[in-house]
């Protein structure tokens, strides 16, 4: 009898042990599934895209009060070519440094020449008077050429692209990006008037909407045409102006813009198309070669690159448009996306009496463009149709 009961007891204890193990593992997996989301859900939840959506939901009145969005994680494109590597090496970006106290302007001749227009003397003086602590440069065209040759001697493709541009308006556009990338500060057209000291611009404040100001690039709205025929008048639905730009030395957006313009120029040169109009007209061609079209596109691309998930770059997944013109249309206060600060139309385009722009006395009015159109008479041969 004892020999029969002993195996039964062992079998009973074994069943209890197995049952206990099953219960323990089942409980563990249930608790794990409830307390720890999968890596996919975690990545999606923490993605900059969803962070931005949550921020906009919490700040539904961002267009009236402004926005300062700083993603917890940001991803940047790796250097795609030796040109970008050369630019990054020669002019490294340090966002911790303040904006350089430089003001850059250009004109055909030097400011001491008799042929320098008197009205431009008056305009440029407003920048000097309001910014006595700044170095103010009014660079004549010939000096622009020499300066770019010197600054970009170690990036020969860029120097060549600038040198072979067939029209002075193309060079004038390219120069502003090149000088800001190499030296930083404020670039402003010679036909602009300074309304407030640069040190009083919101871009130079320590905080923006109770968050640390990390601005490295400052752009303003040029056009916000809320009308069905906007494409007949402007290159983009929201267009950033490039008659006044503030930037720190080596900003990555300018690096991408310079690389694009260099590639376009050298490709056109190789194909014998430097003087050909490749767009629907000469104005449109310039807009998308060096002007507000390509400038606006590159600013948007930079902001969107910051907000992409890492899988986009690692696995070459589809690039998503997270930020477009809808975020900025109708804005009345600054919007910061990481280190890009976008100013409302009033900041650089007051008194235009349209698209929501206010007058020159508004607190957000920093500079006024007088629209002299001096670049139109550039003394260069006409481009071929």
From Swiss-Prot:
Lumenal side: 37-385
Cofactor field: Mn(2+)
GO cellular component, one term: Golgi apparatus
UniProt keyword list: Endoplasmic reticulum, Glycosyltransferase, Golgi apparatus, Membrane, Signal-anchor, Transferase, Transmembrane, Transmembrane helix, Virulence
Domain of life per record: Eukaryota
Membrane topology per record: Single-pass type II membrane protein
One MF term in the entry's GO annotations: glycolipid 1,6-alpha-mannosyltransferase activity
Locus of motif DXD motif: 189-191
Membrane topology, Cytoplasmic segments: 1-15
Keyword Cytoplasm carried by entry: no
EC id: 2.4.1.232
InterPro entries, alphabetized: GlycoTrfase_DXD_sugar-bd_CS, Nucleotide-diphossugar_trans, Och1-like
UniProt-listed Gene3D superfamilies: 3.90.550.20
The keyword Transferase is annotated on this UniProt entry: yes
Compartments (UniProt record): Endoplasmic reticulum membrane; Golgi apparatus membrane
Record field: catalytic activity: Transfers an alpha-D-mannosyl residue from GDP-mannose into lipid-linked oligosaccharide, forming an alpha-(1->6)-D-mannosyl-D-mannose linkage
Transmembrane segments: 16-36
GO biological process: cellular response to heat; cellular response to starvation; filamentous growth; filamentous growth of a population of unicellular organisms in response to starvation; N-glycan processing; protein N-linked glycosylation
Effects seen without this gene: Results in a temperature-sensitive growth defect, cellular aggregation, loss of outer chain elongation of N-glycans, hypersensitivity to a range of cell wall perturbing agents, as well as to constitutively activated cell wall integrity pathway. Finally, leads to attenuated virulence in a mouse model of systemic infection and affects inflammatory response and the efficiency of neutrophil phagocytosis by the host.
Record comment regarding domains: The conserved DXD motif is involved in enzyme activity.
PANTHER family for the chain: INITIATION-SPECIFIC ALPHA-1,6-MANNOSYLTRANSFERASE (PTHR31834:SF1)
Function: Mannosyltransferase involved in outer chain elongation of asparagine-linked oligosaccharides of the type Man(9)GlcNAc(2). Adds the first alpha-1,6-mannose to the Man(8)GlcNAc(2) and Man(9)GlcNAc(2), but not Man(5)GlcNAc(2), endoplasmic reticulum intermediates. Represents the first enzymatic event required for synthesis of outer chain mannose linkages on yeast secretory proteins. N-glycan outer chain epitopes play a crucial role in the host-fungal interaction, virulence, and host immune response such as interleukin synthesis or phagocytosis by neutrophils.
Family named by the database record: Belongs to the glycosyltransferase 32 family.
Name by which UniProt lists this protein: Initiation-specific alpha-1,6-mannosyltransferase
Source organism of this protein record: Candida albicans (strain SC5314 / ATCC MYA-2876) (Yeast)
Gene name of the record: OCH1
């Amino acid at each position: 009898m004892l020999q029969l009961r002993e195996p039964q007891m062992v079998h009973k204890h074994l069943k209890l042990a197995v049952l206990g193990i099953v219960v323990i593992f089942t409980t563990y997996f249930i608790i794990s599934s409830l307390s720890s989301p999968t890596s996919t859900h975690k990545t999606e939840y923490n993605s900059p895209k969803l962070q931005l959506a949550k921020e906009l939901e919490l700040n539904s009145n961002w267009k009236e009060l402004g926005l300062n969005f700083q993603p917890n994680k940001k991803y940047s494109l790796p250097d795609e070519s030796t040109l970008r590597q050369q630019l990054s090496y020669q002019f490294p970006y340090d966002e911790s440094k303040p904006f350089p106290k430089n003001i850059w302007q250009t004109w055909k001749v030097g400011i001491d020449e008799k042929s320098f227009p008197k009205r431009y003397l008056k305009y440029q003086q407003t920048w000097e008077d309001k910014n006595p602590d700044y170095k103010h440069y009014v660079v004549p065209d010939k000096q622009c050429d020499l300066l770019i040759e010197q600054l970009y001697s170690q990036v020969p493709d860029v120097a060549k692209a600038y040198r072979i541009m067939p029209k002075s308006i193309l060079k004038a556009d390219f120069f502003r990006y090149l000088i800001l990338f190499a030296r930083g500060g404020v670039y402003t057209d010679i036909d602009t008037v300074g309304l407030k000291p640069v040190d009083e611009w919101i871009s130079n404040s320590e905080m923006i909407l109770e968050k640390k100001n990390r601005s490295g690039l400052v752009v303003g709205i040029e056009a916000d045409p809320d009308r069905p025929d906007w494409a007949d008048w402007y290159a983009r639905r929201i267009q950033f102006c490039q008659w006044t730009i503030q930037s720190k030395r080596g900003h990555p957006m300018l690096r991408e813009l310079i690389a694009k313009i260099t590639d376009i120029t050298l490709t056109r040169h190789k194909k014998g198309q430097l003087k050909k109009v490749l767009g629907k007209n000469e104005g449109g061609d310039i807009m998308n070669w060096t002007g507000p079209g390509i400038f606006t596109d590159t600013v948007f691309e930079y902001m969107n690159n910051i907000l992409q998930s890492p899988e986009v770059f690692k696995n070459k997944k589809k690039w998503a448009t997270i930020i477009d013109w809808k975020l900025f249309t109708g804005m009345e206060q600054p919007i910061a996306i990481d280190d890009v600060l976008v100013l409302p139309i009033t900041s650089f385009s007051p008194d235009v009496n349209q698209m929501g722009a206010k007058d020159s006395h508004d607190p957000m009015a920093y500079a006024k463009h007088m629209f002299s159109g001096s670049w139109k008479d550039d003394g260069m041969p006409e481009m071929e149709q």
